[in-house]
Amino acid sequence: MKSLVKWVQVLMIMAVVLMIVMPNRVQAEETVPVLADAAIVVDSETGQILYGQNDKAVLGIASMSKMMSEYLLFEAIEEGVVSWDDEYEVTDYSHRISQDLRLSNVPLRRDGSYTMKELYEAMAIYSANAATIGIAETIAGTEKEFVQMMNDKAKEMGIEDAHFVNSTGLNNSFLLGMHPEGTGEDEENTMSARSVAILTKALLDDYPEILDTAKIPELMFRKGTPDQIRMVNWNTMLPGMDHEYDGMDGLKTGTTDFAGHSFAGTAKRDGIRLIAVVMKAVDAEGEGSYDARFNATRALLDYGFGFQETEIMKAGQQFMGQESLPVAKGEKDHVAVAVKEPVRLLVPSAQQEAYRTELELTAGAPLEAAVEEGQLVGKVRVLDSENNEVEYLKGEKPAADVAATETVERANWFAISMKSAADFIKGLF
């Protein structure tokens, strides 16, 4: 019995030692001091995830919702549904919301009309809620119909966890009983940090000109008129502002009691653009604040810009030990294969040699002749130093195909028959 107890003690000590010297993946990833309920930083070009923290948890997104409203506005303009010069006639709904001093707004006159351009600038720079409602009503007729468009577009983007109940990101309780029909009076828009990053990437990919407005530190609404109001950008990480960050040029803050202090930011340095999302950021005392969300974003971007673009495989490079693949019914038994285009990704500066690649076959094995030169046979799989596959938004893989580098013609029927007979005889011995 004493011997058994002694062995149990030894095993427990060994387990503790192993836990210390061999941290699990979660421990290994805890390298970014991000004080937030959820966070993610990705390469905007490829969608490669550089760091994620609780990034699949569905949380409140507050005014980050307006990025979807912006997307639908740009799409409507592109499709000719509306134009920048189209006038919006203020409704009772948008007018009453615009007069609520608790909310971010530019006041709208009840008998006034405003162009899409004016409303868009107020939404993008000042997060104006009534202006956003005006855009929604112009495009879809009602905010209810616009919300349906928001949810449909999210699914089209591959976002499965989005739940939009209004166009602004406000809690419905602030909409004075005029919230979209079919939504709860205390509901709020929700999504995961990963999905917010997908939305941000789609917006930047499809309508990069959005940054022309998002990067404006301040602008006068209706300058030179009695309605003139100074709009200061809520993104104070822009150049010349309180939390200035080199390369920052967008994109959208968000704050409600439910969502906390959140931010979807983007910055570009040395040709690399990153997207960082923080949700419900807090300070060291656990309190939410404007400073907290920007400090968390800074930590994410600093970490991300510590990565370097690295060519993991060159175009034409072959896989060691898999320079060729077997071919059935061909004039040759094997066909040479190689990477069709270079494989590039962002890797930490200190881990340039830590990544390796594998060939992931997409064609049947063995291949059956005829095999044409250039025929795709697989994809490149990239693994990190801990043997984990490099992760991308929406599960994308590195955009690198593996293809045949020669043609193997199909053998004639006699050769195929003789080969089958030879294989049969070989199998007897």
Feature-to-residue mapping (PLM):
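Structural motif marking the loop-to-transmembrane transition
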Residues: 1-4, 8, 61, 112, ...
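Sec-dependent N-terminal signal peptides of Gram-positive bacterial secreted proteins and lipoproteins
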Residues: 2-28
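Periplasmic/cell-envelope proteins involved in peptidoglycan metabolism and beta-lactam response
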Residues: 2-4, 149-154, 426
